[in-house]
Amino acid sequence: MITLTGHTLTIEEMKRLLLEGEGVTACPTSMQKVAECREVVEKIVENGKVVYGITTGFGKFSDVLIQKDDVKALQHNLIQSHACGIGDPFPEEVSRGMLILRANTMLKGVSGVRPLVVNMLLEFVNRKIHPVVPQQGSLGASGDLAPLSHLALVLLGEGEVFYKGKRVHAMVALTEEGLEPIELEAKEGLALINGTQAMTAQGVLSYIEAEATAYQAELIASMTIEGLQGIIDAFDENVHKARGYKEQVEVASRIRDILHDSKLTTKQGELRVQDAYSLRCIPQVHGASWQVLNYVKEKLEIEMNAATDNPLIFDGGEKVISGGNFHGQPIAFAMDFLKVGMAELANISERRIERLVNPQLNDLPPFLSPEPGLQSGAMIMQYAAASLVSENKTLAHPASVDSIPSSANQEDHVSMGTIASRHAHQIIQNVRRVLSIEMICAMQAAEYRGIENMSTVTKSFYHQGRQQVPSITNDRIFSTDIENITHWLKTNYSIKERLDVNAAL
């Protein structure tokens, strides 16, 4: 059970919450702050004070005063009218993350909701009732209005949820769990939907997958180094310390550890003086991607604990301030950066695939074919990798450079952060498939070189891979092989655990 405080949530805790289904509870001290802040809202309504989103309309309607008797209707109307999401739903892990992050931001005690609302969000998390939230429709400012409105709907007994493996109406799940839908009161609708929790939840899942995929890329690249009898000198510690990037040094160190007892690597001058960049520069390229990952993790952990709705209430109600913390620009930039960093792992992987299959670049059978000419072997696998890499290049175009004004030009600059976050996740799926192709080719090359000559780590990884796909002894439908390895990487390593050298042993 993980305790939410509004201030201390980490990526490691989110892994447990999203991927292992761990439950959550609220810190009592934080809940007391929620209750105290709610008293301020009640006084504002009772006194008829003009405060945006509490006693006024929204967006362009911020100058329209709302009568006391209409305050509840205002919040309900807000949720229904803003539930304009379209397209396929987010993965359940993302909608679960949205519930968690929305509760966590409310626990900062500046949003003005009742403790009841926070408790309802936590009930959904702990009972694994996950809102069906369409992926498209958010501009990323005023936060993720459309996606979060679909989240808010289910608290009211409206909309759909994923529950016990099925997609059902929210009331089906609520009834079975013995829960009553809530009725929103002043400010609560706005507090539920004004924030960055859709882009951030998707960003967290993307980061978790990206981190493990980056570790996998090092292990798979190490197998390729063996298959091509790569020069180990390029990974010498002195080379990488001379440049000074810690991530580059760490990648080189892990590859040295992976290959320390390999009989397939060579020294410079034995077979050739230098390797191609796709081998020699693995620490420089992969290390740079790790720099991106470290940056993204830092920004996500800030946003996970941020107050992102509007207005915010401070100093016991002395200050009720309209601001713009809902603007998703920090996450938009981070997700666009993640797209580029991960796309490069696929770019360099595809070049290693080419070196494994091109007979002009190695002494292996052409296209790793068991009978070149009659059988094409891995020829079209390289085509598939090239296609995925090119698709990533289009997806990597920064969403954050775009902005379209909305709400009659009141909201005249937006982040497009949710688009960036969604595209980052798509890129990571493509990267994993490219790496799967590289692994298939590297395993085949290892067989030609002699499996007994592989390092202890890569040999273990090879045997695990061969449990998923057989050797290429004849042409067959290779798309099945690619998907099998992709699924195996994702379910056994990618989002379940951090892969280090010992994980393959």
Swiss-Prot record:
Pfam families: Lyase_aromatic. Pathway: Amino-acid degradation; L-histidine degradation into L-glutamate; N-formimidoyl-L-glutamate from L-histidine: step 1/3. GO terms for cellular component: cytoplasm. The gene is hutH. Keywords: Cytoplasm, Histidine metabolism, Lyase. Belongs to the PAL/histidase family. One of its GO terms (molecular function) is histidine ammonia-lyase activity. Its main location: cytoplasm. It is found in: Cytoplasm. CDD domains: PAL-HAL. It catalyses: L-histidine = trans-urocanate + NH4(+). GO terms for biological process: L-histidine catabolic process to glutamate and formamide; L-histidine catabolic process to glutamate and formate. Contains an active site 4-methylidene-imidazol-5-one (MIO), which is formed autocatalytically by cyclization and dehydration of residues Ala-Ser-Gly. HAMAP family: His_ammonia_lyase. This is Histidine ammonia-lyase. Its EC number is 4.3.1.3. It is an enzyme of class 4 (lyase). The keyword ATP-binding does not apply. PANTHER family: HISTIDINE AMMONIA-LYASE. The modification 2,3-didehydroalanine (Ser) is found at S142. There is a cross-link at A141-G143 (5-imidazolinone (Ala-Gly)). The keyword Cytoplasm applies. InterPro entries: Aromatic_Lyase, Fumarase/histidase_N, HutH, L-Aspartase-like, Phe/His_NH3-lyase_AS.
